[in-house]
Amino acid sequence: MTAAPNDWDVVLRPHWTPLFAYAAAFLIAVAHVAGGLLLKVGSSGVVFQTADQVAMGALGLVLAGAVLLFARPRLRVGSAGLSVRNLLGDRIVGWSEVIGVSFPGGSRWARIDLADDEYIPVMAIQAVDKDRAVAAMDTVRSLLARYRPDLCAR
């Protein structure tokens, strides 16, 4: 049930978190690669091999890749419903399943409210983005009113 790129009315992404994720991933990768290259410099009593250097650099690249997962969050809204991509995985929630969208006080990100007190976190709309998060919630709520007018009548 993959929708074409033009089927989405709006695509929302966080603003600050990807920037911090890119910077942190870069620093982690550089530190581990540099540390790996410098393992054989000097004598500390431990004999490091080339495999240790390669492993140190590879570990840094793996950790940097894990940090880059924080740059993935995205919310797409369209006639098919809401497509939520957080750190791992992508889920399309049909309009028939949605009973609301909310941003509870004290939360780090928004959520899609489902039946039976269930919800899906939406990491694409984060509190750290402040005014952008407010604008994003306004956009999502206006699209909710368009596709689920029965919810707004309550």
UniProtKB/Swiss-Prot annotation:
It comes from the Bacteria. The keyword Membrane applies. It is a multi-pass membrane protein. It holds the Pfam family bPH_6. One of its GO terms (biological process) is riboflavin biosynthetic process. InterPro entries: CFP-6_PH. The chain crosses the membrane at residues 19-39, 51-71. GO terms for cellular component: plasma membrane. It is found in: Cell membrane. Keywords: Cell membrane, Membrane, Transmembrane, Transmembrane helix. Its main location: membrane. This is Uncharacterized protein Rv1417. It comes from Mycobacterium tuberculosis (strain ATCC 25618 / H37Rv).
